[in-house]
Amino acid sequence: PIIEFLPYNEQLLVKLREMKANGAYLVLATATHHTIAEKIAAHLGIFDEVVATSGAVNMAAANKSNCLNQKFGNKQYSYFGNSSDDYAVWDTSKDVHVVNATASVLTKSLSLYDVKTVVERETSFIKTLIKAIRVHQWMKNALIFVPLLASHQLTDPSMLINGVIAFVAFSFCASSVYLLNDMLDIEDDRQHKTKKFRPIAAGNFSLIHAMFLYPIFLGAAVLISFLFLPIEFLMVLAVYYIMTVTYSFGLKKIFSCASLCFLSVIPNSY
């Protein structure tokens, strides 16, 4: 990753800089590989030491807790964490600070510890998910109903139901490609004036979630098409997917022209 364009939590950095100014010894303790962690520490310029994954030791959970206890002693340090892996570290830390955690991690942390600081997520997971899969773009797929309207078949119940199912399948397929596109373009998006605010680029929606949901949305689109629509529609969906993936790999002008021709194929597919 390009270190200077990573999505840093400014609210946390402000607090850490205040602590540093008051004489605190700051350690970047992370499960990230040390080659990346050291570059991050050098870029931020506030950490006195880096404790990170190296070799066969993954510096997370119990490994991180043991390392910090050896360095500073049990209950002799404050720890800022964000995931369920951090419970093992919070168990042995003096002060617990929760940063950018999920609702479940935050709730459990508040029930287990005397939490000193909470830096909450800007938006909920559901809102971030909706933004990541670009639900607002689904309206573009309403074009699928235009041929029904033009052929006066919109009042045909079976055709209308098939149209709605096709709309859902196309929307799920499109969302899978949006996730793929944002994963592939994450470094470029982080350097872009406006795209850096997209959930994945901004770090509000994790790559792990994106990698998990991408095949789910794609699989759902294929399954819906296979179960409820003619095989011709599934073939059309496959062409649509190939075209949109081609778009993701940079052939945007070709895609724009081809998409106009593609719309004329849809009416005969369901």
Residue ranges and their predicted role:
Residues 4-154:
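C-terminal cap/substrate-recognition subdomain and adjoining C-terminal extension
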Residues 193-234:
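Multi-pass membrane catalytic core of lipid/isoprenoid biosynthesis enzymes
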Residues 127, 139-143, 158-169, 209-213, ...:
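Alpha-helical transmembrane segments of integral membrane proteins
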Residues 146, 156-184, 232-246:
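Membrane-embedded alpha-helical segments that form the functional core of polytopic membrane enzymes
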Residues 80, 173-201:
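Acidic (Asp/Glu-rich) catalytic motifs at the cytosolic membrane interface
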Residues 152-167, 219, 223-230, 252:
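Membrane-interfacial amphipathic/re-entrant helices at transmembrane-helix boundaries
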Residues 145, 149, 219-226, 242-246, ...:
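Alpha-helical transmembrane segments of multipass membrane proteins
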Residues 124-140, 199-210, 246-264:
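Interhelical loop and helix-boundary elements at the membrane-water interface
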